[in-house]
């Protein structure tokens, strides 16, 4: 994962933002740090349904059994939210992902109450899709 903070640093950085405008800008910046997704990975198999914007997420298991996540979106905030999810699932096995609840982290960040309903639904769709695919890999 290129230049993304770990979970604890994400939370620290997020709470240091003075207001929600700064927090949104930080989320967008995180999305800009994601590695470029290969064009061939932008296919129906990797499409996340339930998002208003176009979202693709690719999951691969490396030689050590760790899940590597890559993704892209045509919306900057959604791509940033994707980066947040990837940070939370970083260095986990498929089984770890299935059993890890990201919602307490979102509560610590006060994230969900500041998202529009459509973005919240899209965020949930990304999490459901990642966990469902992880369940098939575990």
From Swiss-Prot:
The active site is at residue 51. The keyword Metal-binding does not apply. It is found in: Cytoplasm. InterPro entries: Cysteine_desulfuration_SufE, Fe-S_metab-assoc_dom. Keywords: Cytoplasm. GO terms for biological process: iron-sulfur cluster assembly; sulfur compound metabolic process. Its main location: cytoplasm. Pathway: Cofactor biosynthesis; iron-sulfur cluster biosynthesis. GO terms for cellular component: cytoplasm. Signal peptide: none annotated. Belongs to the SufE family. Participates in cysteine desulfuration mediated by SufS. Cysteine desulfuration mobilizes sulfur from L-cysteine to yield L-alanine and constitutes an essential step in sulfur metabolism for biosynthesis of a variety of sulfur-containing biomolecules. Functions as a sulfur acceptor for SufS, by mediating the direct transfer of the sulfur atom from the S-sulfanylcysteine of SufS, an intermediate product of cysteine desulfuration process. NCBIfam families: PRK09296.1. Homodimer. Interacts with SufS. This is Cysteine desulfuration protein SufE. The gene is sufE.
